[in-house]
C-alpha cells in the first residue's frame, strides 16, 4: 500500500505553524495546543521559525554528554 500524507498518527502536540492536515480524527489544533493534551513528563516546543522541535526540561548534562567527542585511545594520545 503506498504511503499517503496524513495517514501516520501525530506523536507530538500541534503548535503554531503546524498544518491541520493529518490530525487524528476529532483532534483540533486548538485542543492539541491547550496544554491538557500534552504529556506531563515531556513537552515539545517549536523554535521561533517553526523549523524544529525542542524537548524542554532536559538537564544540560544530557546535551553536554551528547556533544562530547569520541574518546581517544591511548595510542593516539601518546604516539611513539
Curated annotation (Swiss-Prot):
Looking up Pfam families in the UniProt record yields:
UPF0731
**InterPro entries, from UniProt?**
FAM229 (IPR028025)
The region called Disordered is annotated at 1-44
Name the domain of life.
Answer: Eukaryota
Give the UniProt family note: Belongs to the FAM229 family.
Name of the protein this chain belongs to: Protein FAM229B
Organism of derivation: Macaca fascicularis
Give the encoding gene's name. Answer: FAM229B
Amino acid at each position: 500500500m503506498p504511503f499517503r500524507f496524513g495517514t501516520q498518527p501525530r506523536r507530538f502536540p500541534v503548535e503554531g505553524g503546524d498544518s491541520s492536515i493529518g490530525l487524528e480524527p476529532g483532534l483540533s489544533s486548538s485542543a492539541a495546543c491547550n496544554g491538557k493534551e500534552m504529556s506531563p513528563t515531556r513537552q515539545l516546543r517549536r523554535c521561533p521559525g517553526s523549523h524544529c522541535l525542542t524537548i524542554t526540561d532536559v538537564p544540560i548534562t544530557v546535551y553536554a554528554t551528547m556533544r562530547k567527542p569520541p574518546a581517544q585511545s591511548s595510542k593516539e594520545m601518546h604516539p611513539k
